[in-house]
Regions:
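N-terminal pre-catalytic "stem/leader" segment of glycosyltransferase-like enzymes
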Residues: 1-95, 383-391
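A nucleotide-sugar donor-handling region in carbohydrate enzymes
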Residues: 2-16, 139-211
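Conserved catalytic-core segment of nucleotide-activated headgroup transferases in glycan assembly
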Residues: 39-53, 58-59, 177-251, 357-366, ...
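Extended catalytic core of nucleotide-activated donor transferases of GT-like folds
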Residues: 48, 67-139
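Short internal beta-strands
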Residues: 57-67, 145-150, 228-232
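A donor-sugar binding/catalytic signature common to diverse glycosyltransferases
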Residues: 123-124, 268-310
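Nucleotide-activated donor-binding/catalytic signature segment of Leloir-type glycosyltransferases, i.e.
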Residues: 243-267
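C-terminal amphipathic helix plus adjacent low-complexity
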Residues: 332-391
Length: 391
């Protein structure tokens, strides 16, 4: 079953390199623990350039529990990638190594297989800043430190979580955030429609694909706009109706009317590259909305149709036009107004610092690397004191 890839979607295949890793030790001081299946590889991919910079000064190894994920990562980075299926193998590697820091980009339950080690520091770095409920998950309390982009994350966590220790939050900015070169709006403007996925539970049902999608895109195309549809990698993973709506959207963009404006589906292009030749973003409550802010270009955010979706008021949602499902047919009019009269631009500009800690990726990278160095130094000091005390 494992070798045929027939496991449930969220389960790693557990086909590890354990035999080869017998007796192995790591030279690296940092590990990234990523037990996710391949479909969630995007969560780590965005961090690879940053982790490669950290590797140059501390050494970084990635530990996975899925052979498909490991193979995929090896094709995208020169970082050492290990696939460890057995707890005993992981125990041995940690015990034989002087790993000082473990980083985590997701809330996978299997993170606790690494979190149980008390000899190193554990830091959650996430995979994007957003106003989603999961951004203030109580699971954050499991980590020694939580690296956040800006004040918005600090405020959200301290407001939503009971008894969270403020000293565990470290503001580092967003190394992935960068402002593309300004661009004049062409005669045929390009709209990036980048909805999120349906989520794993009702409180996370932010996706507009089944509730807005076809009507929204039809309105934009009818208004003479080029639409680039960038679905989330997990769109349709949990709900057949969302998968069907996604398929319908793809067919819609292949129709002659959409083709006349150059509309297309483009799911694979890196996000920052996708931003470069786009004039407006229409998205859901998600990290994509915040990554867009440094562009300075208009932004429209949908309103979740599912009343169970947790979408509390926030500085971002208060500052941009919102599009409920009942108004999806007016998307073309809303976007045209934003292009002709971008009255929200000053408010959005103020939010770049609030959410992302600025738009200088080099400064954010420096803060991230320094924060990792600090955790390693603090861990080494504690371990050294314990060793001198004979413990």
């Amino acid at each position: 079953v494992r070798r045929l890839g027939l496991l449930p979607g969220g389960e790693p295949d557990g086909l590890g390199d354990d035999v080869r890793l017998t007796g192995a030790a790591l030279d690296q001081r940092v590990v990234v623990f990523f037990p996710e299946p391949l479909r969630n590889g995007y969560q780590l991919e965005q961090w690879l350039p940053v982790l490669e910079a950290l590797h140059a000064r501390q050494g970084v190894a990635v530990i996975t529990q899925d052979s498909r994920t490991a193979a995929w990562l090896r094709g995208r980075t020169a970082l050492p990638v290990l696939c460890v299926a057995r707890t005993a193998t992981l125990d041995g590697i940690v015990q034989r190594s002087d790993v000082a820091l473990a980083l985590y980009v997701s809330h996978h339950p299997r993170n606790f297989q690494m979190l149980r080690f008390s000899t190193l520091g554990h830091v959650y770095i996430g995979h994007g800043e957003s106003d989603k409920a999961v951004s203030a998950s109580n699971q954050l309390k499991a980590y020694d430190r939580v690296f956040v982009a800006g004040r918005a994350a600090e405020d959200r966590i301290l407001t939503e979580l009971l008894w969270f220790d403020r000293s565990h939050l470290v503001r580092v900015g967003r190394p992935q955030a960068a402002a593309p070169a300004p661009r004049p709006v062409p005669a045929v403007p390009t709209v990036l429609y980048a909805p999120t996925w349906e989520g794993a539970q009702p409180s996370m049902a932010y996706s507009s694909v089944p509730t807005h999608g076809s009507t929204l895109v039809s309105s934009l195309v009818a208004a003479g706009m080029r639409v680039v549809y960038r679905p989330h990698p997990r769109t349709g993973a949990n709900r057949r109706d969302v998968a069907a709506a996604d398929a319908a959207l793809r067919r819609l963009l292949e129709a002659p009317e959409a083709q006349r404006t150059g509309s297309r589906t483009d799911p694979d292009r890196p996000l920052q590259e996708a931003f470069e030749d786009v004039d407006v973003l229409v998205t859901d409550v998600s990290s994509v909305a915040l990554e867009w802010l440094p562009t300075g270009r208009p932004l429209v955010v949908t309103v979740p149709a599912d009343p169970a979706a947790v979408a509390a008021a926030s500085p971002l949602l208060d500052a941009v036009p919102r599009l409920p499902s009942s108004a999806a047919g007016s998307a073309g009019t809303v976007v045209r107004r934003c292009l002709d009269d971008d009255r929200e631009a000053p408010a959005r500009a103020e939010l770049v610092e609030h959410y992302l800690g600025g738009s200088d990726p080099d400064a954010a990278l420096s803060r991230f690397l320094g924060a990792c160095d600090d955790v390693i130094a603090a861990r080494d000091a504690v371990r050294g004191a314990l060793s001198r005390a004979g413990r």
